[in-house]
Amino acid sequence: MSSGANATTIDVPETRAEAKGKAPLIAAPIVATTKATPHPNAGWKKGLAIFDFLLRLAAIAATLAAATTMGTTDETLPFFTQFFQFQASFDDLPAFMFFVVATAIASGYLALSLPFSLVSIFRPHAQGIRLLLIISDTVMLALTTAGAASATAIVYLAHNGDSSANWIAICQQFTDFCQSVSGAVVASFIAVVIFMLLVMMSALALRKH
């Protein structure tokens, strides 16, 4: 408090409430939380990857059965002459040998592709793996189809012959031989169908939307 000649002033200290009122307001910090949301296409792409893996296992069985059945096909008739022995073997015909090589290569490729297919199950949006698989599957599809088609032509001639070329049907004599090669051809076409499904599924998985 101070006094003067004409006026008297009294200094009143600010109360705690008034001091609080003049204090600057500090806003409470806002914490933004983000929650990872799953990709809308992750579910069906993972399902495709699982189905892809199972189809590859089935294709391995089909190509391996085709290669081993054709590669072990051999039949010798119980009768023979002094100069001839009637025998039929897969390695007598280049088409059957190409069939064995083609299906064996396809079987080996399918076994090597299983780890990549397994990775696609856990990473369904990995585009690079899918692109590699679709290119490789297309090449193997062409190779398996070529082998199956060449063997089919020989099997048809073995069953029916060709009168214009004087080729007789041999399946009436070599029954077991014809049954084995026919079964191998059927197994190879099953593998061809599976390869077609694999290519279509990979193309579907590569779609962005």
Swiss-Prot record:
Coiled coil start-end: none
Localization, UniProt: Cell membrane
GO cellular component: Casparian strip; plasma membrane
Transmembrane region(s): 47-67, 96-116, 138-158, 184-204
Membrane side Extracellular: residue ranges: 68-95, 159-183
Membrane topology: Multi-pass membrane protein
Cytoplasmic side, ranges: 1-46, 117-137, 205-209
Entry's Gene Ontology BP terms: cell wall modification; cell-cell junction assembly
Entry superkingdom: Eukaryota
InterPro entries: CASP/CASPL, CASP_dom, CASPL
Entry keyword set: Cell membrane, Cell wall biogenesis/degradation, Membrane, Transmembrane, Transmembrane helix
Matching Pfam families: CASP_dom
Chief subcellular location: membrane
Assembly: Homodimer and heterodimers.
Family note: Belongs to the Casparian strip membrane proteins (CASP) family.
Known function: Regulates membrane-cell wall junctions and localized cell wall deposition. Required for establishment of the Casparian strip membrane domain (CSD) and the subsequent formation of Casparian strips, a cell wall modification of the root endodermis that determines an apoplastic barrier between the intraorganismal apoplasm and the extraorganismal apoplasm and prevents lateral diffusion.
PANTHER family: CASP-LIKE PROTEIN, CASP-LIKE PROTEIN 1U1
Protein name (database record): Casparian strip membrane protein 1
